[in-house]
From Swiss-Prot:
This protein binds to the 23S rRNA, and is important in its secondary structure. It is located near the subunit interface in the base of the L7/L12 stalk, and near the tRNA binding site of the peptidyltransferase center. PANTHER family: 60S/50S RIBOSOMAL PROTEIN L6/L9 (PTHR11655), LARGE RIBOSOMAL SUBUNIT PROTEIN UL6M (PTHR11655:SF14). InterPro entries: Ribosomal_uL6-like, Ribosomal_uL6-like_a/b-dom_sf, Ribosomal_uL6_a/b-dom, Ribosomal_uL6_bac-type. GO terms for biological process: cytoplasmic translation. This is Large ribosomal subunit protein uL6. It comes from Dictyoglomus turgidum (strain DSM 6724 / Z-1310).
Length: 180
């Protein structure tokens, strides 16, 4: 059995879980509500105060799906109780960010500012013009938007200028040797 899939997902007291049509799971908590539809190959049940994911056989694909589904449901429960956050930092002279309405405006060395539409369900805040915080209840959406922001100007390996995740280490390269 999948070691992750075998573990039941505990449901906290302030969270309501509803399973519709056998494979559509709706989780409602203090921070909001998430609904996801999973593969019909698996059986999702609510037993006592836990969600149990079961699989019909031991095929490789079904085993992988088993662990994935359990992890996604666990992330849904964590999202509506604690929420998720990704932090990014801008490094480079004149690099700055700001939130304008429902857009994140990045000035990262291009001839024009880059505007990114903030998806519904996410809150983006900027501290000191160089630190961006992306928060939300859907882990996938938070990570995807943070990756889109980072892809605008990924940190380069020579000077380290660009957008990076907080705490991310950029491997520095030596420049050209030069003439002697």
């Amino acid at each position: 059995m999948s070691r992750i899939g075998r573990k039941p997902v505990p449901i906290p007291q302030n969270v309501q879980v509803e399973i519709k049509d056998g494979n559509c799971v709706s989780v409602k908590g203090p921070l909001g509500q998430i609904e996801k539809t999973f593969s019909p190959l698996l059986t999702i049940k609510k037993v006592d105060n836990q969600i149990v994911v079961e699989r019909p056989n031991d095929e490789k694909f079904v085993k992988a799906l088993h662990g994935l589904t359990r992890a996604l449901i666990n992330n849904m429960v964590l999202g509506v109780t604690q929420g998720f956050e990704k932090r990014l930092e801008l490094q480079g002279t004149g690099y700055r960010a700001r939130v304008q309405g429902n857009k994140l405006v990045l000035e990262v060395g291009f001839s024009h500012p880059v505007e990114l539409e903030i998806p519904t369900g996410l809150t983006v805040s900027v501290q000191d013009n160089t630190k961006i915080s992306v928060k939300g209840i859907d882990k996938e959406l938070v990570g995807q938007f943070a990756a889109i922001v980072r892809s605008v100007r990924p940190a380069e390996p020579y000077k380290g200028k660009g957008i990076r995740y907080e705490g991310e280490k950029i491997r520095q390269k030596a420049g050209k040797a030069g003439k002697k």
